[in-house]
Amino acid sequence: MNLPNIPENDSQPRHLSDLVVDYLELLGVEYVFGVPGGHIAPLYEALERSECRGGPRAILSRQESGAAFMADGYARETGKIGVCCSTTGPGATNLITGIASSYSDHVPILAITGQTILPKFGVGAFQESSPDVLDTTSMLNKCTRYNSVVTHPKQLENKLIAALKSAFQSPPGPVHLSVPVDVFRSPAPETISYPHIRQLLTKPAFADLAAIEKLGQMLEKLSSQNRKVVLLVGEDCGEASSEILAFAELMGAEITTTQGGKSCINPYHPLYKGVFGFAGHQSARQALTDSSVDLILAVGTTLGQWATSTWDRALLNERLVHIHHVNSYFSRSSMGQLQVYGNIKTVFQELVKRMKSSLLVGKVSQKEGALEDPNSKEKPPQIEVQKPESYYSQETPIKPQRLIYEMMQRFPAETRFLIDTGNCMVWSFHYLFLPHPENYRSSVELAAMGWAIGGSVGTAFGRPNTPVVCLTGDGSFLMNGQEITVAVAEKLPVIFIVLNDRSYGMVKQRHRQVVKEGLEFAIPTVDFCLMAQAMGANGYTIRKPEDFDKVDYCLLYTSDAADEKGRVG
């Protein structure tokens, strides 16, 4: 088999770095995000050659963690593997937070780091991070699905394939290869050994049929007694959303979600009652604690602190059935009746098939199961939010609830929303509702500040000509805001909304709740509008609701990055 798009008259010598890029091209990967350096230079040279023939190209981030966040955003948007790279030493260590974030959120990314030449391992070479010295590979052991140093040129292809396969296994996640610069420059074969690599990355559709049979019997008994089942949908349910909704409609089961699961269920479905747990809705808690509920199906959730409302017995009790494709999480549901291990889509396909054969009709009629308004930009009527009147507040400084409302009103349905860590998450969990829930993205496990900034850039690369909104805080922006220059340079339609309360607000509020003392955790006054303009973006300051009319929203369709600063009270 000829390598991807290589001209037949190309007499330039091929290196193993070219082989890596060839595999990325076979997988449809368009970009590699990273910061260059001497020990990773051969990969950049290969990407330059690739770009000239229309293949994958390099995107230069401003810091390596930003590159990892971009790869994460690209992977979430496209379903492909996200790829990031760095040089050895500090370049590799800067990647760690981004890699750990993807590990916690089950996002497949390939991280490639350069390394000192093999003969100089252990002798103190510049920025050496081999297993004999700093050992960045060991640092990444606990946040990767595959992690290896390539110590011979003949290892590279097989280790690359092993890494790619591991990235898409259950659970998916980041993988890492540390490649010495002399290995990268070694001669490459003219053909590749795994031309059908896509087939090797197919996710297995496995399921514990015995556990499904037992759950089916429990559901049939419950239905015959007119007792209820309620669902808690977690962050790992995206591929099974339609099957879960079909099951819920068949059973008449109300649906709640975790914070991450918010992206899996349309909030305008009449059975949806909102988010349970941290920053959630009272209507969701009422659904779970209803005395007529005999089973709670917790699906695709890690049952962590936020998702369980700090391990609340309202959820974690003997009514619980835990369904997940990662069996290590079952240690968190020992109080429940049953654990069902398997591909979530497969599990619910089997449950729907079984319940259709045992029930004469579904509990929810077609009319009742229809969306309240598939194009609505208002709060879903069946979800109870705190102070709903704050959506329309005219106060100055502008209230976060009003900002969220304006976001719902002003951006088109296809807009992607990436929500950063901090109070941004709190407001979005509770007040932001999208008729296309899959367009809502957050990172709720590691919850690294600044994830959404790099992630929004990667998302924009993955979905050209589609508006992307990043909601972030002033603290996060000061950590990672330099990545806006990538959006500017590439003319990406991204709008960065900065909640400016001049403090690490979430930390300050939590500290006051616990300690009752007034530590401010203050951030000095920064003019983010001027900061954005200095980086080449359009900048707007939003102090009152009328200021939203100053923003040129046409920029989202002309591939010009924008920055919008909101000072919130």
Q: Which residue stretches match the model-derived regions?
A:
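N-terminal alpha/beta PP-like core and its mobile active-site loop of ThDP/TPP-dependent enzymes
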Residues: 2-358, 413, 486, 493-496, ...
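Conserved short loop/turn motifs at secondary-structure junctions
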Residues: 233-239, 392, 473-475
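Beta-strand->loop->alpha-helix junctions that form or flank phosphate-binding loops
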Residues: 254-260, 422, 542-546
